[in-house]
């Protein structure tokens, strides 16, 4: 079981540390809501992953691998990320962003939901689970049954919590040293990154 756990941990780290829309959103919320935002966001991400594991064992992976599903996810997800990114850029240009805590956007429920939705909007994330993740799950299930799957999921999601939590803690605790103008530039840049990912998803759909 230790091999399954550490394999899941290593594989998840390799994916979590790659730049993507979820990391971009985590940095943005850490600046806005504080050092613990990443943990809440990844909790939403974890709920989606747990749901995907259940659906995959029900045969849903076939649907996720289909061209039509990938196209729909890419188009809808791409448009969602473009909208979020554009909103960040526009608010930065209009000087509507501020470092102070935004209670509405910082509610745990909102960040939890966003972690779920942003992950679901990423067609590459869903395809990874439908292909690569499925292979690991099958091996874990063959060796140790449901316990093996649980061990794999635990190792996988622990890596996400460690990485995104660390990023959130670092960004959230240093935000007080960031000047307002620099903060607006950072938010605009992060918005541009989301637009880039959204455009990529949409184009590849």
What kind of feature is each model-predicted range?
Residues 2-71, 131-151:
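Juxtamembrane transmembrane-helix termini in multi-pass membrane transport proteins
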Residues 13, 17, 86, 120-123, ...:
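Hydrophobic/aromatic residues within the transmembrane alpha-helices of Major Facilitator Superfamily
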Residues 22, 48-60, 81-87, 91, ...:
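Alpha-helical transmembrane segments and their lipid-water interface positions
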Residues 66-97, 156-167, 175-205:
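Selective transmembrane alpha-helices of multi-pass membrane proteins
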Residues 93-110:
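Flexible interhelical linker loops that connect adjacent transmembrane helices
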Residues 108-132:
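Selected transmembrane alpha-helices and immediately adjacent juxtamembrane segments
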Residues 124-140, 201-204:
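Alpha-helical transmembrane segments and their membrane-interface junctions
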């Amino acid at each position: 079981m230790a091999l399954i756990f550490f394999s899941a941990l290593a594989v998840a780290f390799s994916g979590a540390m790659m730049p993507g829309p979820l990391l971009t959103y985590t940095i943005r919320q850490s600046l806005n809501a504080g050092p613990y935002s990443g943990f809440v966001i990844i909790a939403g991400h974890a709920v989606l992953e747990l749901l995907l594991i259940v659906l995959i064992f029900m045969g849903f992976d076939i649907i996720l691998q289909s061209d039509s599903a990938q196209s729909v996810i890419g188009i809808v997800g791409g448009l969602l990320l473009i909208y979020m990114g554009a909103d960040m850029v526009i608010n930065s240009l209009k000087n509507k962003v501020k470092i102070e805590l935004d209670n509405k956007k910082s509610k745990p429920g909102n960040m939890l939901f966003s972690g779920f939705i942003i992950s679901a909007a990423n067609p590459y994330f869903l395809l990874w689970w439908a292909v690569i993740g499925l292979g690991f799950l099958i091996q874990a299930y063959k060796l140790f049954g449901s316990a093996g799957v649980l061990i794999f999921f635990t190792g996988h999601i622990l890596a996400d919590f460690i990485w995104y939590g660390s990023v959130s803690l670092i960004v959230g605790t240093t935000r007080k040293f960031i000047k307002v103008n620099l903060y607006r530039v950072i938010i605009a840049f992060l918005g541009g990154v989301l637009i880039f990912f959204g455009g990529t998803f949409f184009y590849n759909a």
